[in-house]
A protein has these predicted regions:
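Glycan-recognition surfaces in beta-rich domains, encompassing non-catalytic CBMs
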Residues: 3-161
Length: 161
């Protein structure tokens, strides 16, 4: 009880002194119709996905129909989709066993998405892969380069027409 008493008498008083003035006004909400009518895709409803080193996998308690890459020889998953927006949901973990994927859209590398994150705890994270004003047909490739043993979990995709 001495610890708790000390906390309430000393620590909370110090916190009150160090907080300063806090602006309690919230910013105006931002609304965009751009992401309305987003569609969900996973291995249960996506067709035409070329898998090389990836395999269908129950990736997470809330995402049962994803894909897993596990190995060191490299691999990819590739598909074609008509969309204006594409998001990838992947699993983050604070572990060197989780790797980074290079994302290619229409043959050009657009980003690398690392699933080894200091704040990862097997949680889903979203990465924007395409964010265009107009819908168009795109070829998307998620590529794992050869190297150290690594794992990468793609849980699902979201897209807007």
């Amino acid at each position: 009880t001495d610890f708790v008493d000390n906390y309430y008498q000393k620590v909370l008083a110090a916190v009150d002194e160090n907080t300063g003035d806090v602006d309690k006004n919230l910013p105006d909400p931002v609304f965009s119709a751009k992401y309305m009518n987003m569609h969900y895709m996973d291995s249960a409803n996506m067709t035409g996905v070329e898998l090389d080193g990836f395999r269908e996998y129950d990736t997470h308690g809330s995402f049962h129909n994803g894909w897993l890459y596990k190995g060191s020889s490299g691999g990819s998953m590739k598909f074609t989709l008509t969309c204006s927006v594409l998001e990838m949901v992947f699993k983050a973990q604070n572990s060197d066993k989780y790797g980074a994927a290079d994302i290619y859209v229409d043959g050009e590398k657009v980003k690398s998405v690392d699933s080894n994150m200091s704040d990862g705890w097997d949680n889903p994270v979203t990465a924007y892969l395409i964010d265009d004003a107009e819908s168009a047909e795109h070829t998307v490739e998620i590529r794992m380069e050869p190297g150290d043993a690594q794992a990468y979990f793609v849980m699902a995709f979201g897209y807007c027409d």
